[in-house]
Curated annotation (Swiss-Prot):
Cellular component terms per the entry's GO annotation: extracellular region; immunoglobulin complex
BP term (GO), one: immunoglobulin mediated immune response
GO MF terms held by the record: antigen binding
Domain of life: Eukaryota
Residue stretches making up the Ig-like domain: 1-117
Family annotation (SMART domains): IG, IGv
Name of this chain's protein: Ig heavy chain V region X44
InterPro entries, per database record: Ig-like_dom (IPR007110), Ig-like_dom_sf (IPR036179), Ig-like_fold (IPR013783), Ig_sub (IPR003599), Ig_V-set (IPR013106), IgHV (IPR050199)
Species classification: Eukaryota, Metazoa, Chordata, Craniata, Vertebrata
Organism: Mus musculus (Mouse)
Keyword terms of this UniProt record: Adaptive immunity, Immunity, Immunoglobulin
A Pfam family annotated for this UniProt entry: V-set
Other notes: This chain was isolated from an IgA myeloma protein that binds galactan.
Length: 119
């Protein structure tokens, strides 16, 4: 059974940093492209980026490429999202997804909530 478990979300102040993790199990993690996607409150899904199996190719949505870094550790079956310079509009549920060979998201995690607030 394919399982994806995100963690690392929480409350972060504007301008701060946060690192999300996604632990994968039930499949050969090292063979698959992986992706991060987010959904802000009341909004649709927004693709953040994707990484190929050996980390040689990483693609980002243009507006996020200067503040988010996607990486992976195949030995630990874990995908990462390093977030920096966060703003209130980065408040969202963050999901990792295993991509199908044809590019669509075949499996999703349950998500981890990131809230950006000064309070």
């Amino acid at each position: 059974e394919v399982k994806l478990l995100e963690s690392g979300g929480g409350l972060v102040q504007p301008g701060g940093s946060l690192k999300l993790s996604c632990a994968a199990s039930g499949f050969d993690f090292s063979r698959y492209w992986m992706s991060w996607v987010r959904q802000a409150p009341g909004k649709g899904l927004e693709w953040i980026g994707e990484i190929n199996p050996d980390s040689s190719t990483i693609n980002y949505t243009p507006s996020l490429k200067d503040k988010f870094i996607i990486s992976r550790d195949n030995a630990k079956n874990t995908l990462y999202l390093q977030m920096s310079k966060v703003r209130s509009e980065d408040t969202a549920l963050y999901y990792c997804a295993r991509l199908h060979y044809y590019g669509y998201a075949a499996y999703w995690g349950q998500g981890t909530l990131v809230t950006v607030s000064a309070e």
